UniProtKB/Swiss-Prot annotation:
Gene inactivation effect: Impairs the chlorination of flavonoid at position C3'.
Entry similarity comment: Belongs to the FMO family.
Keywords, comma-separated and alphabetical: FAD, Flavonoid biosynthesis, Flavoprotein, Membrane, Monooxygenase, NADP, Oxidoreductase, Transmembrane, Transmembrane helix
Gene Ontology molecular function, alphabetical: flavin adenine dinucleotide binding; N,N-dimethylaniline monooxygenase activity; NADP binding
Keyword Transmembrane: yes
Organism taxonomic ancestry: Eukaryota, Fungi, Dikarya, Ascomycota, Pezizomycotina
Organism: Aspergillus candidus
This protein's encoding gene: cfoE
Identification of the protein by name: Monooxygenase cfoE
Role: Monooxygenase; part of the gene cluster that mediates the biosynthesis of chlorflavonin, a fungal flavonoid with acetolactate synthase inhibitory activity. Within the pathway, cfoE is responsible for the chlorination of the flavonoid skeleton at position C3'. The pathway begins with the PKS-NRPS hybrid synthetase cfoA that uses benzoic acid or p-hydroxybenzoic acid as a starter unit with four rounds of chain elongation using malonyl-CoA to form the chalcone skeleton.
A GO-annotated cellular component: membrane
Pathway where it operates: Secondary metabolite biosynthesis; flavonoid biosynthesis
Amino acid sequence: MRVAVIGGGPGGLTTLKHLLEAHKFVGGDPVEAKLFEAEEGIGGTFLKRMYEDAELVSSKYLTAFSDFRAREDDPDYLPAARYLEYLGEYATAFDLWPYIQLSTTVTAVRRKGRSHVISYATQDGKEGSWLCDAVAVCSGLHVTPNIPSIKGIDKVPKSFHSSGFKSREQFGSDTTVVVLGTGETAMDIAHLAVTAPTKRVVICHRDGFSVVAKRTPSPVVFPSLASQLQSPNPPVPVDTYLHASHKWGNLPGNVFDSLVKQGMWLMTGTSAGYDQWVGGYPSPRWHTSNVIFTKSSKAMPYISKPYRKDTILQRLRSSIVQVPIPETHGRHIDIAPWPSHIDSEGVLHFIDNGRPEYKRMEEAEVVRPDVLVFGTGYTQRFDFLDSTYPSTSDLDVRDVWRRDEPSVGFIGFVRPGFGAIPPLAELQAQLWVLNLLAPERLQPLLPQDEPHYRLGMPSDARIKYGVSHDDYANQLAVDMNASPSFMDAVRIGSSRKEWWRLPLVWLLAAEFNTKFRLCGPWKWDGAVDVMSGELWDVVKRRGGLLKQIVLSGVPLVVFGSLHLVLWIFTSLFKPSRW
């Protein structure tokens, strides 16, 4: 079988790797695979869109591929440049380079009988074609900038999309900077702007957002005794233990939603987000299973500063427990509704959203931006595919392929509400390759097993491909018979001296991809070492018994009890598949 991979980002690299290694795991003849990458190097968006102080928003423990881990001395959150280096090391470790064609743009994909013809052009002007049996589209979510139309934008001296942002120097000095959007990149840019020699920084949102901390907050209990009570352990990446809701109805998700909101209120005084006193989602939409969190919180102290409440209740709460609030050195970021237009004088006008920020901006000095940055995300285009091919909106099998076109897979086109795309792309690649080569080894891929992992996005949302990371990852593993049970973890770990480590990591940690290499068609001998070593150390970092109970014990007891009841119910009444 010959397979073309389009795109050399994380999704393309892991797809190429699994194609080349498939015969070792599922048998059969080796696959002939070739990866086409338009740029001069691999890495996708991490190659083209690095900017000052950029780092991953997901930890190295979650983001790293299952069988190629980040270095022990790497920080928890890799700088973008280091992650790019990691991808190069991955390609070297699995000998992918001979199968990668750099500086080669795929110009068209067309059908020839049951096969596909890849037409391509190199940067030096050469053209060619390659006949193959299957195509993996891995061109990435973050390629074509999404730039909304704003009347009067030509009145702003300098405007550009965040894809063109590199450093603070682009803001200039004594300038008014406006950032449109509240995603991670927009928040990073707003923080860089407010810590640069600018005059004023404004950030605009459409209909709310929710910021969460990447690292577990370290609240001070009874601040007057802080020096005695603060934990000596470094903060733990949140995505190494976050528990998602599961497929058995809404009750577990509602309990989790309540725990998250109450926890944020207890530590920061607000349940809208991490130290987020303004700009939250409207109540009907604000549920943890319905949103994509913003995992960049450095700008939040500057945004919340004018809105932070000083009531008797807040004073009482903060005297008992409080996350330290970073110093803003007298600066703040104005938050505003989405702009309606820019007038002939270059003044920005805002849509009246009925929120406190609109009233405050109406009473404040007019906003006349010198620099406007569109932190408004990206759209997906597949101009190289002709009209007979599916697009991402047509995918009806695990958001990877269309049921009547299994030879064309789309890898990496989901967005986790809290998590990382690369590990999900790895699981997608495993599922798609297995379906190509040994479909009999899969469980039935039923449509009714999909709604539970989808985020409940509103119909007018720009992003319609949101998923719950843990639920989606586990579903793909279940499809491949690669999701070990707790008793599997006990059995597999029983041969080791520290036999308890593996089952405890199974219980207390997130859905790391390495967990799904303990068994199944992609079983890897090194999985036990990673789970019982590196990932055990992460779980152990949480500190004492109290923190373990709060971070893992409470969710385990709550969700475990709910699932025990459901298990008894299904055992007694044996309903059909949910």
